[in-house]
Amino acid sequence: MTTIIIDSTVDLYYDHDEQLKKIRLKEPFYFKIPSGLEVQIGQNKFIIVEELHIEPDVNTLLSNVCEKGIIQEIPSDTSIIPECYGFSTRLESPLKVYLPLDTKVKLPVGTKLKQKEIYAFFNLETEVDGIIFSSVIPSILVDRLNVKIDIEGNTVNNEYLMNIPLYEKHEDLLIDFEEKTSPNNKSRNKSRNESQDKSRDKSRKKVCNTHKNKKTLDNVKPDKNIKISVSSNKFTTNKPKSNKNSSDSDGSTKTTKSTRSTKSTKSSKSQKSTRNSDVKLIELSDSNQYSEDIPLVRKKKNKNPKESINHKKNDSKQNIFVEKFKNKNNKNDSTNCRKSNRTTTRDVTNSDSEQKVENKNRSWLSESISSESDKSDSEQSDLTEDETEENVSEEDETEEDETACYIDNKDYRKLLSKLSQYLEPKYDIVKIANYIWVNWDLKKINKMGVKDVLSLFLEGNNNRLNESDFYLKNYKLFDSDDTDDTDDTNNSCSSEVDDSD
């Protein structure tokens, strides 16, 4: 048991006819409290410890603390000031008193403290004002104790507590402890249990619905005249060819084109995901604000702009097929067509003229598709997936040339190595390096330290340094010998970026 000093300004409570009455002490009193309580001094939180390097006992903590506050018995012959009387009296017999939590007290000289979340002990040499924090069982005690705690008739082993995350341990134990004396918490626990039951019911319904959908799909019998091709859970129907009408042949060619376009897009997505898997660069928006989803690489300029936007929205599938087919057989015709489309879209300004251009393009596309449909199927089969993969590989190579400015730079690699050497593994070092590399010049980065980089990164995400990060030393990112090389690398990097633009 440790002691704290209580002045005449602190309110104490005692039971009287099933009600709490308030009193104050006339003279300073040394109040005994159990070790293990949390105390806030300034902005830091500490744990009161009875002896240094020895963890407190949780059983004594629970026996001396309740929802009303810290329990202690005041001896007789102590002068008190009763409520609403204004004069002082003396106790004729000992009185059981409750010191409420979140009250301001004085910690005397010699009080032993342990800083929360850090294995560091302190011994006070002067009186300090502190606030008893509203916490009964600190989470740091539960982690290291190998005892069984009896809460509402249920024993909780340390093995069970170690499986719960740190931020949940303290809340669960505090709720169970309050259920002894406060019946109001039962409604809160009921609502929590109801929400858990609802989530379980939803998961069961989803499983049942999946089984039902499987049964319905099995019972359906497809028509013999329609062929179904499956690609990644998407069905596309292909009608059989008929030589009677040219309209049927047009429909069949459109369906085959749509299936090939979907395959090409899927193959391109799968290949882009596999490339550059070793190094992941974060990207920023134009406003230089940090976001995890937006890429950090600069936007490419379209060196070869294609048709107008309206033309892409309306006939995107037809454009994909026609452009690929004409690039192989009729390159001159496709280039002339694109030039004509560009000149028409630039000259036209009014809405009426834009509609005319769209109608012309659609009519030209319909005529070209109808003429191509009369050709043999062997010419259409020449567009294989291998050619689409070659087109995708060419696009990926252009993207790698632009991002090589970040990866191949010596200073960028040094920055990554320094951050990985001094920062904790909980931070994503690649994200922090890219955020600093894009938003600040090399001259400013040379003057920064590891702690400066971390604080700037967290401020960009509307966060602040944690208590553990305050003890991080501000190591320099670059040595004095490396500063001469950084200017040259920065100029080379900027010239490469300008050339790519």
UniProtKB/Swiss-Prot annotation:
The record's region (Disordered) falls at: 179-404, 480-501
Q: Where is the sequence biased in composition, kind Acidic residues? A: 379-403
User: Which portions of the chain have biased composition (kind: Low complexity)?
Assistant: 231-274
Polar residues: which segments have biased composition?
A: 333-352
Q: Where is the composition biased (Basic and acidic residues)?
A: 191-200, 215-226, 304-316
Write out the biased-composition intervals (Basic residues). Answer: 201-214
Annotated protein name in UniProt = Uncharacterized protein L157
**What organism does the UniProt record list as the source?**
Acanthamoeba polyphaga mimivirus
